[in-house]
């Protein structure tokens, strides 16, 4: 099993404190978001991890991953960036956004499924947008 992590966004909505830094490289408790992801992927036996990068790709210095640079990231949406790795979508593969922290049990539940396609959804996602004046629920799919 392989994993593809989409990290080609420009982080337009991120805090000024970490501008020009990919969101996945923001540290939380001394570890980057993508390092949390890689730990979980290792625990479930993922063999190869492909990280699709865009702007600031030179800031990624992760070991044991293969990089795919989306040369057209400014013209692509998330699906366009994912298509840069289409040759790796042929077999069993996990696909993630690079700025989401998830628990091991979520990936274990996905892997137990017998379905061809499985999508993990936070059913309480709307609570994250309550009271916001910036980055409203209308932007949730972006």
Tell me the role of every PLM-derived stretch.
Residues 1-5, 13, 27, 31-95:
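Conserved N-terminal catalytic core of the sugar/cofactor nucleotidyltransferase
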Residues 8:
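The conserved beta1-alpha1 loop
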Residues 11-13, 126-127:
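Short, acidic Gly/Pro/Ser/Thr-rich loop/turn segments
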Residues 16:
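Canonical Radical SAM [4Fe-4S] cluster-binding loop centered on the CxxxCxxC motif
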Residues 19-24:
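Short alpha-helical oligomerization interface
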Residues 63, 104-142:
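Conserved core of the sugar-phosphate nucleotidyltransferase
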Residues 98-101:
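The conserved acidic donor/metal-binding loop of glycosyltransferases
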């Amino acid at each position: 099993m392989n994993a593809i992590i989409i990290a080609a966004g420009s982080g337009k909505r991120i805090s000024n404190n970490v501008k020009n830094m990919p969101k996945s490289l923001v540290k939380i408790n001394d570890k980057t978001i993508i390092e949390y992801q890689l730990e979980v992927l290792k625990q479930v036996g993922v063999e190869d991890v492909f990280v699709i990068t865009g702007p600031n790709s030179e800031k990624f210095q992760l070991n044991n991953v293969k990089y795919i640079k989306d040369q057209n990231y400014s013209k692509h949406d998330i699906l366009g960036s994912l298509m840069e790795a289409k040759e790796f979508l042929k077999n069993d593969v996990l696909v993630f956004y690079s700025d989401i922290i998830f628990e091991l049990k979520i990936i274990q539940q996905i892997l137990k499924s017998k379905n061809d396609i499985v999508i993990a959804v936070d059913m309480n996602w709307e609570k994250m947008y309550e009271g916001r004046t910036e980055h409203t629920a209308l932007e949730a799919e972006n």
